[in-house]
């Protein structure tokens, strides 16, 4: 039996999300769990974002090569290509989009210690949709369309080792 990390609701009443004008910002949401993937997409669409979904890192990588996104929200543990493996490919290709990684397994201290993962924002599962939307808004507001610069230490790490090692 596999564990499912669905978002939790902070109170009994489910509050509808206001459809705010988010200038059609495009988000790629990557989640292995079908129900969570669909719920996440619905919440983001209701908030005014354009959303594409992928069920694993390999599908996400294909989408990233074909389209431009303003934000990537990715799961960590997925079949075919994990979240960290997806980050390796993104950084090796010099893509600079902001990234939120949602996980219930990877401790945040591991991210803090690795220079390649410092631009990545962590969203620990289970999370509320309000927390997800708050983080999305914050990340998009602080980075805008410019994306996130890959840290210099990360660039040299990729050039010399071609990998992010955790």
Each model region followed by its residue ranges:
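Non-catalytic signal-transmission and effector/linker regions of two-component phosphorelay proteins
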Residues: 1-26, 130-166
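Charged docking surfaces used in two-component/phosphorelay signaling
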Residues: 38-46
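Short hydrophobic/Thr-rich beta-strand motif most characteristic of the beta2 strand and flanking loop
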Residues: 48-55, 63
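Acidic catalytic/metal-coordinating carboxylates
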Residues: 55-59, 82-85
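Active-site beta3 strand of CheY-like receiver
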Residues: 67-73
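Receiver (REC) domain active-site loop signature in two-component systems and cognate sites
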Residues: 78
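Alpha4 helix (beta4-alpha4-beta5 surface) of REC/receiver domains from two-component response regulators
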Residues: 85, 106-124, 130-134
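Hydrophobic/aromatic residues positioned on beta-strands within the core alpha/beta folds
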Residues: 102-103
């Amino acid at each position: 039996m596999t564990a499912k990390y669905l978002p939790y609701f902070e109170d009994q009443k489910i509050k509808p999300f206001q459809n705010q004008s988010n200038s059609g910002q495009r988000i790629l949401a990557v989640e292995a769990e079908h129900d969570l993937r669909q719920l996440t997409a619905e919440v983001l669409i209701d908030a005014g974002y354009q959303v594409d979904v992928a069920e694993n890192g390999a599908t996400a990588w294909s989408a990233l090569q074909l389209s431009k996104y303003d934000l990537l929200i990715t799961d960590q543990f997925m079949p075919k290509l994990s979240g960290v493996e997806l980050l390796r490919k993104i950084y090796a290709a010099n893509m600079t989009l902001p990234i939120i990684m949602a996980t219930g397994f990877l401790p945040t201290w591991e991210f803090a210690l690795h220079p390649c993962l410092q631009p990545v924002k962590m969203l620990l599962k289970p999370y509320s949709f309000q927390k997800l939307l708050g983080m999305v808004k914050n990340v998009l507001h602080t980075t805008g369309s410019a994306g996130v610069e890959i840290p210099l230490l990360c660039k040299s790490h990729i050039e010399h080792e071609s990998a992010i090692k955790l």
